[in-house]
Every structure is written in C-alpha cells, then in structure tokens.
Amino acid sequence: SLTASELLPGRERLLVSRAMSKAFAFAGARVGYLLADPAVIDALRLVRLPYHLSGITQAAALGALENAEVMLAMVEDIRQQRDRLLQELPGLGYTVCESQANFVLFGGVENPKALFEQLLSHDILIRDVGIPHHLRVTAGTEAETSYFLETLATLAR
C-alpha cells in the first residue's frame, strides 16, 4: 500500500499535512509539516507569518524528525494504554467514549470538579473539558495509567 507522500509526484494539487502533536509528543508546540508540490510550498511561503515558530521549537521538531523511529515507537505504547483505559474504566463504573486519540473521555462522573481536585491531590492531572459529568484522561506510561486507575478506584464517583 502507498503512503500519502508517495502519491505526491505528478499531483500538483495534492497536499499532505501531519501534526506532530501526538506521535511525536509535541502537543504544546503546535507543530506539524506539509508536503506538496514545490510551487504550492513557494506560494504558501508568501502568505505565512514571518515568525511562525520559534528557533527552539524548530530545533526540537527537527530533532524529533531525525529520531522518528524512536518517537513513533512510542505511539504503540500510547495506544496500548489508551485501550487499557477504554477497557478498565467501565469496570470502575464509568462510561467511555471510543477513541482513536491519545486520550479517553469518560462519563458517569457525579461531580467532575470534585473528582478533578481529588485526583490532583494525588498528583494526577486530567482535564475537565466542560461536558457535564465527564472528564478526559490522557494515556500515559504503563505506570502512570496503573496509578491513575488504582487511585480512581479508591475515590467516590
């Protein structure tokens, strides 16, 4: 099977973009890349902001790309922990929203603010995304996921 980038030659209207946020653990950097015909890239250079990324962010992104094999190997670990969250949260009495991302939205939370604060007191930071009776947890390492699930099991829903 072909990758999208292999379809580029001879297709001047095809653009392939990819965010580096999840696979490269760069969520806060807001960085990605675009593959396209050189004429399209030249046209985009004319309209982009002059200082769209800091030098530090650019250097970090280049370092990540140079070590893509190592960085992308982490994706499978993240998927495993996400799938573990999807599997184990219902056993604790929560509903889960199916996810292909690096996080899981779970519901059935009686008081999201209180649970958020209880978890925070255990040094666990999750997100209250403003959906009633729901919270969002990011898939972490195996140890982080275990700690989250074990702690959550001891707290009131």
Give each language-model segment a name:
Residues S1-S5, F24:
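Conserved PLP phosphate-binding loop immediately N-terminal to the Schiff-base lysine helix
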Residues L7-R11:
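Short, conserved loop/helix-junction motifs that constitute active-site signature segments
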Residues I78-R79, D83-H122, L135, A139:
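Conserved PLP-binding catalytic core of the aspartate aminotransferase-like
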Residues E117-S121, R127-R157:
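PLP-dependent enzyme catalytic core of the Aspartate aminotransferase-like
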Residues R13-P90, Y94-C97:
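PLP-dependent aminotransferase class I/II
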